[in-house]
Amino acid sequence: QIQYHKVVKGETLESISRKRGVTIAQICKLNHITKKMKLRPGQILRYS
């Protein structure tokens, strides 16, 4: 099942990966982004 995370101000890929129990690489692959991309509050990310 696909799950989503809504980015809030101050979050990073690292903090989201820890919170959701997935790797940064998994988040990047599912969302077609790179580690260096800036996240925006309100952005929706898939994480599983």
Go through each PLM region and give its residues.
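Short, small/polar residue-rich loop motifs at catalytic or cofactor-binding pockets
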Residues: H32
